[in-house]
UniProtKB/Swiss-Prot annotation:
Record GO cellular component, one term: plasma membrane-derived thylakoid membrane
Task of the protein: Component of the cytochrome b6-f complex, which mediates electron transfer between photosystem II (PSII) and photosystem I (PSI), cyclic electron flow around PSI, and state transitions. PetG is required for either the stability or assembly of the cytochrome b6-f complex.
A Pfam family recorded for this sequence: PetG
Electron transport as UniProt keyword: yes
Disulfide pattern: none
Gene Ontology annotations of biological process type: cytochrome complex assembly; photosynthesis
Native organism: Gloeothece citriformis (strain PCC 7424)
Source lineage: Bacteria, Bacillati, Cyanobacteriota, Cyanophyceae, Oscillatoriophycideae
Gene field: petG
The name this protein goes by in its record: Cytochrome b6-f complex subunit 5
Length: 38
């Protein structure tokens, strides 16, 4: 049985982690385009 606190923590951290990775990848991609790098 999963504790509600742990479940809430995971449900809160997962979207933030995915959003952070997406933003980091987007910024790196955008920076690469500005430098004309493939």
């Amino acid at each position: 049985m999963i504790e509600p606190l742990v479940l809430g923590l995971v449900m809160g951290l997962v979207p933030i982690t995915l959003a952070g990775l997406f933003v980091a990848a987007y910024l790196q991609y955008k920076r690469g385009n500005q430098l004309n790098l493939d």
